[in-house]
């Protein structure tokens, strides 16, 4: 019989996760002026949406959650789920390959909080380590593809293909609306292209492009190299033909193959896209993996997502920063190149360091071994009289076995190997870095063949003659000692959660507990192919089912898809579902999307991607949606109204008390309500968007549910819906249990291998713990608002003077009076050892602060002390004691080197620069560079590793 004895409090995970203890919570409440956390919730949230606890003290929607487990209990349950999976030898291919992650990279990147707890490098002076790693990634991609500029990762190969399509469409600027797609692209890529193309009015023409480009006008062409069938085809003639007819060409290129075969750029391709998964990143049942997108430099400004560039700091030293940010959704909104926000930075770093560790010779050697196994397989098949369909291939052999495909697949399965049955007559077998001669022999036996002593008669594919990865970054770290120290040196340049709170509003930088992270490196989860037989993955499927049940209860929705692999993709999938619902009802004219002026730019960019027209709704002076303006615009667009996108609590950091009336106004006009779940950390256990008016929401598992941000990804953005939208959730052509329509990610369940993090968090917190986390997050934000309001006015509060889980500090008056900017304050915080809050969003000239429930009272107080000390420095500028152009704020951040000059000419002391609150305040953070010149970096765009001479 199981042990029913309650766990001692010392083992309760909730007390490890939530920073303030009971005494600290009392201090928070006393400062705020409320007697209890429940009273705080009653004052902050509208009564109409606030869920009441049941008689047994459980919040509605959370009663189905199991009782909170200890860390050891949760890990034991996860281990049991993992052990129910079968780790077969995967030779399926189709874009996913087994790989050998070097232990030095697993230990020092994937398992290192200095890397996985960092945020997107918007504060470049304290992000130089991961920016350098991302520059290595971009250099790796450009070298291997033969193109000139690559971005700092995409979500996966399929979405990279879709972005390549829209990039070419923008770049051509002609009347053509047709895209030619080769029939031999991966099925999942073709499905994502179809989903993305339809609302944009793009017609996809699928054909065997080895026979040439079909008649008619095209803006672009997409081919795969090698193809899904494994064939290596010379596409140079097609590229020339496409260019003659005014079309651009994008190649889905395998980067390992590109070490041997002629790369896309050298055959004239304009764009290359793909995945870096086989560079040390586990398959993970589909993700997460870092996709890539590379172009010629003339198309650099058309690239979506993050782009790292080289600039200079205030002393003229080389420094890295995010370049050309005006392309991105947070600035250009519905005119952005993409809605991509979070990408796959952690996996991009892993792939880049895999390339650095192996170097060009090592990568070429791995590729040659993979190709050698494939040739040995083909030779054995040919000797046995089995037809090898293509004689030119890299790693994948396609065998023609009339009527025997299922028989061969079953025979391979009996030997512990999964192969790919293309149809009843063809079997595809893919070799990879983990393939051995024994695996080849076993597969041959499944065909009724045996290894051959002869080489395969097909042509050689090793046609690449150009060098690659010649920068010292890919040759200097070939020993484990040097790589370990390199990774440590990079991490030491950054501020992540292992060094400081990261109070970024709208980002929810909470604890990513070690127990939550532990399972993601287990082989039973990591070495699963997304298209493996369902019988191999019962544990993963049970985990996914648990999450679907738990998350729908928490949010009040009826169904959920875990496929979207970022919040941006969740938004996109949710809006697609709304449009599909309208179309199914004959309301195809409903294309207007109402979006408040305070919304995150991703909302508008996502609406544009599904063909909606964005109409902006005004906000009142207190930050709430202007209900009169909303009603007027609902009336004006009633017959064409598709949806309202609204973030709740609002992007202004308050619970709008009109939310029920807002939703009702849209519903009365036949529209749907999209409740952006970015701020769900302020709702869990208190209110459910699916019950107060939402028809659909996306969740950010990398915010509310503890998946780490990884320096800019991975993320997971599940989309949850009410029942009437459920038929339009994302499907997948290669998952029998899903429909074939509305595919938004390359894998059926997106970034499945990091779902154990969220599973563990919910399992260990339980219903009461989740609700407590929300309440403490709200209390901590209100405490900061109370402590700092007299120094920096809090811009918005709710009807009872409360904020939600974040607060906006208004510096506009300070800037007008003193000349000190929000940028000055953000940079100065680094001298105090803190990462800055979110700058100038959603209101220019402000700081948005979100402490989360995980930060202790002492850490919150230290942040407040730093902000108060900075206000005193501002006052010295305002009084004229320090010039506006020469003071510790304008000079921030201060490097050690900048203080070691022989003659100090500033009106403030070196001690004031480096230790403004004394040497005992907190561990010193030394920024590696001074303030970076952003304009210089955009004017002189360099997006690959600069030559060594540049640092001389």
From Swiss-Prot:
Pfam families: GcvP2_C, GDC-P. The keyword NAD does not apply. Its EC number is 1.4.4.2. Its cofactor is pyridoxal 5'-phosphate. One of its GO terms (biological process) is glycine decarboxylation via glycine cleavage system. It catalyses: N(6)-[(R)-lipoyl]-L-lysyl-[glycine-cleavage complex H protein] + glycine + H(+) = N(6)-[(R)-S(8)-aminomethyldihydrolipoyl]-L-lysyl-[glycine-cleavage complex H protein] + CO2. Keywords: Oxidoreductase, Pyridoxal phosphate. One of its GO terms (molecular function) is glycine dehydrogenase (decarboxylating) activity. The modification N6-(pyridoxal phosphate)lysine is found at residue 703. GO terms for cellular component: cytosol; glycine cleavage complex. It is an enzyme of class 1 (oxidoreductase). The glycine cleavage system is composed of four proteins: P, T, L and H. Belongs to the GcvP family. The glycine cleavage system catalyzes the degradation of glycine. The P protein binds the alpha-amino group of glycine through its pyridoxal phosphate cofactor; CO(2) is released and the remaining methylamine moiety is then transferred to the lipoamide cofactor of the H protein. This is Glycine dehydrogenase (decarboxylating). The lineage of its organism: Bacteria, Bacillati, Actinomycetota, Actinomycetes, Mycobacteriales. The gene is gcvP.
């Amino acid at each position: 019989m199981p042990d029913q004895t309650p766990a001692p409090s010392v083992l309760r995970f909730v007390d490890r996760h939530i920073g303030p203890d009971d005494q600290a919570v009392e201090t928070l409440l006393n400062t705020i002026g409320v007697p209890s956390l429940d009273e705080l919730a009653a004052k902050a949230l509208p009564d109409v949406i606030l869920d009441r606890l049941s008689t047994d003290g459980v919040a509605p929607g959370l009663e189905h959650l199991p009782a909170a487990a200890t860390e050891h209990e949760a890990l034991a349950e996860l281990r049991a789920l993992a052990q129910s999976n079968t780790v077969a030898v995967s030779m399926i291919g189709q874009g996913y390959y087994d790989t050998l992650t070097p232990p030095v990279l697993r230990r020092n990147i994937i398992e290192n909080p200095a890397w996985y707890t960092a945020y997107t490098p918007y504060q470049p002076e304290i992000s130089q380590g991961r920016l350098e790693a991302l520059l290595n990634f971009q250099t790796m991609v450009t070298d291997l593809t033969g193109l000139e500029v690559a971005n700092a990762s995409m979500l996966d190969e399929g979405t990279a293909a879709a972005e390549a399509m829209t990039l070419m469409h923008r770049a051509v600027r002609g009347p053509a609306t047709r895209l030619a797609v080769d029939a031999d692209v991966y099925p999942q890529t073709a499905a994502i292209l179809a989903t993305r193309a339809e609302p944009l009015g793009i017609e996809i023409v699928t054909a065997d492009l080895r026979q040439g480009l079909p008649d008619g006008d095209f803006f672009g062409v997409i081919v795969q190299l090698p193809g899904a069938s494994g064939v290596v085809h010379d596409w140079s003639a097609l590229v020339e033909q496409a260019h003659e007819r005014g079309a651009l060409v994008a190649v889905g290129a395998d980067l390992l193959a590109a070490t041997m075969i002629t790369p896309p750029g050298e055959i004239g391709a304009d764009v290359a896209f793909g995945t870096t998964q086989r560079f040390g990143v586990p398959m993970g049942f589909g993700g997460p993996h870092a996709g890539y997108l590379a172009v010629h430099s003339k198309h650099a400004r058309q690239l979506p997502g993050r782009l790292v560039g080289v600039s200079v700091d205030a002393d003229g030293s080389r420094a890295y920063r995010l370049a050309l940010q005006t392309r991105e959704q947070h600035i250009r909104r519905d005119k952005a190149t993409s809605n991509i926000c979070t990408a796959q930075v952690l996996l991009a770093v892993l792939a880049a360091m895999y390339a650095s560790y192996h170097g060009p010779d090592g990568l070429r050697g791995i590729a040659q071994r993979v190709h050698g196994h494939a040739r040995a397989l083909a030779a054995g098949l040919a000797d046995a009289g089995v037809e090898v369909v293509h004689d030119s291939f890299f790693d994948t052999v396609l065998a023609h076995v009339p009527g025997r495909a299922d028989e061969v697949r079953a025979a391979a399965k009996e030997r512990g190997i999964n192969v790919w049955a293309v149809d009843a007559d063809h079997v595809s077998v893919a070799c990879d870095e983990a393939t051995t001669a024994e695996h080849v022999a076993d597969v041959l036996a499944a065909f009724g063949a045996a290894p051959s002593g002869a080489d395969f008669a097909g042509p050689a594919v090793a046609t690449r003659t150009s060098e690659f990865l010649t920068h010292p970054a890919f040759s200097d770290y070939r020993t484990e000692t040097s790589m370990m120290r390199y990774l440590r040196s990079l991490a030491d340049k950054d501020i992540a959660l292992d060094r400081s709170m990261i109070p970024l509003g709208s980002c929810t930088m909470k604890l990513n507990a070690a127990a939550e992270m532990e399972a993601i490196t287990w082989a039973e989860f990591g070495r699963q192919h997304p298209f493996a037989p369902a019988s191999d993955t019962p544990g993963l499927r049970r985990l996914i089912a648990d999450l679907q049940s738990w998350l729908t209860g928490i949010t009040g929705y009826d169904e959920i898809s875990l496929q979207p692999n970022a919040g941006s993709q969740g938004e996109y999938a949710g809006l697609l579902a709304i449009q599909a619902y309208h179309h199914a009802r004959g309301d195809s004219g409903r294309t207007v999307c109402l979006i408040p002026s305070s919304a995150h730019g991703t909302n508008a960019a996502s609406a544009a991607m599904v063909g909606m027209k964005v109409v902006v709704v005004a906000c009142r002076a207190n930050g709430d949606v202007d209900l009169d303006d909303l009603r007027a615009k609902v009336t004006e667009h009633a017959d064409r109204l598709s949806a309202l996108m609204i973030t709740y609590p609002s992007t202004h950091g308050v619970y709008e008390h009109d939310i029920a009336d807002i939703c009702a106004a849209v519903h009365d006009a036949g529209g749907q309500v999209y409740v952006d779940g970015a701020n769900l950390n302020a709702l869990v256990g208190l209110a459910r968007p699916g019950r107060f008016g939402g028809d659909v929401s996306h969740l950010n598992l990398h915010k509310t549910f503890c998946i780490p941000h990884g320096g800019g990804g991975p993320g997971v953005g599940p989309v949850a819906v009410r029942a009437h939208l459920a038929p339009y959730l994302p499907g997948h052509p290669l998952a029998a249990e899903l429909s074939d329509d509305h595919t938004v990610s390359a894998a059926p369940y997106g970034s499945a291998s990091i779902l154990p993090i969220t599973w563990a968090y919910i399992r260990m917190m339980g219903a009461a713990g989740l609700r407590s986390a929300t309440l403490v997050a709200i209390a901590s934000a209100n405490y900061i608002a109370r402590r700092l309001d007299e120094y920096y006015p809090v811009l918005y509060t709710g009807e009872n003077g409360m904020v939600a889980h974040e607060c906006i500090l208004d510096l506009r008056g300070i800037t007008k009076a003193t000349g000190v900017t929000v940028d000055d304050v953000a940079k100065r915080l680094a001298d105090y050892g803190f990462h800055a809050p979110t700058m100038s969003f959603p209101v220019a000239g402000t700081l948005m602060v979100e402490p989360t429930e995980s930060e202790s009272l002492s850490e919150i107080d230290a942040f407040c002390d730093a902000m108060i000390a900075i206000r005193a420095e501002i006052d010295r500028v305002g009084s004229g004691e320090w010039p506006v152009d020469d003071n510790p704020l304008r000079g921030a951040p201060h490097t050690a080197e900048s203080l070691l000059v022989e003659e100090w000419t500033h009106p403030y002391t070196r001690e004031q620069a480096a230790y403004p609150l004394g040497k005992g305040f907190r561990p010193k953070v030394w920024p590696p560079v001074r303030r970076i010149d952003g304009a210089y970096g955009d004017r002189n765009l360099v997006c690959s590793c600069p030559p060594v001479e540049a640092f001389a």
